[in-house]
Amino acid sequence: MDKNDYLHFERNPSLFPKSTLDKVQKTKKYIEHYYKVAVDHAVERNQRRINLEQRLATERGSEERKNRQLRASGEKESQFLRFRRTRLSLEDFSTIKVIGKGAFGEVRLVQKLDTGKIYAMKSLLKTEMFKRDQLAHVKAERDLLVESDSPWVVSLYYAFQDSLYLYLIMEFLPGGDLMTMLINYDTFSEDVTRFYMAECVLAIADVHRMGYIHRDIKPDNILIDRDGHIKLSDFGLSTGFYKQDQSASYMKPRTGNTVKRGQMVDAIWLTMSSKDKMATWKKNRRVMAYSTVGTPDYIAPEIFLQQGYGQDCDWWSLGAIMFECLIGWPPFCSENSHETYRKIINWRETLTFPNDIHLSIEARDLMDRLMTDSEHRLGRGGAIEIMQHPFFTGIDWDHIRETAAPFIPNLKSITDTHYFPVDELEQVPEQPVTQQPASVDPQTLEQTNLAFLGYTYKKFNYLTMKGAL
């Protein structure tokens, strides 16, 4: 046969239909993910073996004992491999009570059916996360919780998904959150404030150590454990991590009646007594926590101004929370988010301290140095700058988690939820909605599922504990 009789085929992807190209990209992503996960797990497994061998090499003991530990480690790895192949689903958990609600998700107290263990289950609606371009934030939250070994960050045990939701199965902290405490107690003494702010400093410093910026530090996200100590949560909820389009909407100039309403609100707010301000803030606080916009009261001005920001933006938030603990309301609170934003941007004129509330020189100085320009903000050079401030004199930074907390939850059972606003969440369904809305087309659903590829996670150290599986 003459070589000219051969049919030469030149691959030209531009001639393929879009549906074919989409399938190719989808298949490519799935294959890449499969091998990446396999390699990552092999590397982690090998590193655990190396760490164990190095530890055993430094310990005294017989070779027989060391060999037993190595064999036990191998059995645990095999157990973990088997468990990794099982698929978790919503059916593996039963809801005890709804304990929290966000704009696009919920937090439930749940029990794992096969072990009886109690967890907090956070669910996020995938279509909303996808539509609102929250993919990076959702991934950042999951990745931080996976990487964290900090006692100051809520522990993540499992992450999984179905066609509707993303699920994070985390430790349940029965003491509620700092927002609930502030609503119940109005204000804290300086000693109590000192304790909580010191623990917040260490918690934020740990987040920064892992290479993250929280950007949404607020009382709602500071949880209280059974011993009264704090842990940070919510590293990517839609009500936090303000995006550029949200910031831009705040910056639109107000016209017509809107300006007059804002001016009237400010006039009324300025004539309120401290007691009235506190009551007004408490009345509106829960509503703002549940809204799609959230509350900007604790956000640093540089985040709104899109000037670029660093880890020190979290220290501004700490100053705003400290103000609320001592005064009874945040420093820039208003009747609406636009007014709050305006006040934060113009903080030099709007940051004032009420004359009828006594503050020590040290407390006032610390707040002034936290809520200031980023260039001069305390903590810009690291958490040590804040830890050395005179307000924290007497704090045992190395052992603060071992000291008695000023408030220890009085719990009647491991499922006690009376520190959560469960009465306000009665309208939330007992079980998450499991049917896909008719308005969601199959192509969007397929894109959404592909976007969250790799979200699943199971914690090795926890799963291999005795009785954890």
Swiss-Prot record:
CDD domains: MobB_CBK1, STKc_NDR_like_fungal
Active site: D216 (proton acceptor)
Protein EC: 2.7.11.1
Gene Ontology molecular functions: ATP binding; protein serine kinase activity; protein serine/threonine kinase activity
Binding site for ATP: I99, G100, K101, G102, A103, F104, G105, E106, V107, K122
Domain of life of the organism encoding this protein: Eukaryota
Phosphoprotein keyword on record: yes
Residue ranges of every copy of the AGC-kinase C-terminal domain listed in the record: 393-467
CC per GO annotation: cell cortex of cell tip; cell division site; cytosol; growing cell tip; nucleus
Catalytic activity: L-seryl-[protein] + ATP = O-phospho-L-seryl-[protein] + ADP + H(+); L-threonyl-[protein] + ATP = O-phospho-L-threonyl-[protein] + ADP + H(+)
A biological-process GO annotation: positive regulation of exocytosis
Keywords: ATP-binding, Kinase, Nucleotide-binding, Phosphoprotein, Serine/threonine-protein kinase, Transferase
Protein kinase domain mapped to chain residues: 93-392
Entries under Pfam families matching the protein: Pkinase
PANTHER family registered for this protein in UniProt: CHROMOSOME UNDETERMINED SCAFFOLD_135, WHOLE GENOME SHOTGUN SEQUENCE, MYOTONIC DYSTROPHY S/T KINASE-RELATED
Subunit and partners: Interacts with mob2.
Function: Interacts with pak1/shk1 and coordinates cell morphogenesis with the cell cycle. It is essential for maintenance of cell polarity and is involved in mitotic control.
Family membership: Belongs to the protein kinase superfamily. Ser/Thr protein kinase family.
Protein name as catalogued: Serine/threonine-protein kinase orb6
Organism per entry: Schizosaccharomyces pombe (strain 972 / ATCC 24843) (Fission yeast)
Lineage: Eukaryota, Fungi, Dikarya, Ascomycota, Taphrinomycotina
Gene name of the record: orb6
